[in-house]
Amino acid sequence: NHNFTTASPNLYSDMVGESVAFKKVTNIIERVKDNKATIIITGESGTGKELVARAIHYSGKFSREPFIAVNCGAIPENLQEAELFGYIKGAFTGANENRNGFFQAAKGGTLFLDEIGTASLAVQTKLLRALQEKEITRVGSQKVEKVDIRIIAATNANLKDEIKNGSFREDLYYRLTVVEINVPPLRERKSDISILADKFIRKYGIEFKDRLLRIAPEALQILERYNWPGNIRELENIIQRAVIMSDGIIKVKDLPEALKYQIDFPDNGLRPLYEMEKEYIQRVLVHTKGNKTKAAQILQIDRKTLREKLK
């Protein structure tokens, strides 16, 4: 487990950033870290939802208590109840002894339920009771056990859509969303890319090269221009690869080809396709320093088509 510090309000060990979007998240963390209000963390895959949950736990007054992280999507539906709430001997075939679940393991601390949208309806019913009555029952038992834990759930799905299609309980949704923290995608916190890149360069430089590396300004510009569909997880993977491939300074050549030629357009309203296409071609030509053969290769068209599109 990481030991999160509160050296500054926007720094929680593995969480770094200075953008307005990032500070919105850390401001909420500051408000909720010392109470046991139920929290739901939303955001795209790879944005760092578990890091936010850990920051809440380890920066608050319950930091000495257990932090138990569970990915609901990784547990087969028929085992979810037993894994979460425990079971008694003889509850089902193979239940040869009484066994605690994640709820018992998290006693006094925090239970983090990732991918909550994948929880079975049976689990959702028991979870609702745990939140309302602060009590659970093990699989196969009638005995009620009191639970004193903070529940933090996370999802990258739209739970309101899940409610509409009948796969998620509406009453549970409102119980979980006492406090909602939306973790922004990396494309909405571009000013944090250099800080995050530096963190990962330090981490993997020491791990793989036993020394500190640095990144060339033009390579950093490419990282800052890219749209990051895989968010922080994708950035970390790319930096890890670049550290392995580099000779001390991470250069453009150490980055994947896909990053070098992906160009973002500002959303200035709708324009004819030929205008956007021409603008894109011109940007690629700037990138290739006017080399039309190279530009045609990147665009996956022949030179004749390129000439026609530039007319």
Predicted feature residues:
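AAA+/SF3 P-loop NTPase mechanochemical coupling elements
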Residues: N98-G108, F112, S120-K126, T137-N156, ...
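Base-recognition residues in the alpha-helical recognition helix of bacterial helix-turn-helix
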Residues: T125, R129, T137, D302, ...
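Nucleotide-binding/hydrolysis machinery
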Residues: S8, Y12, E18-A21, D34, ...
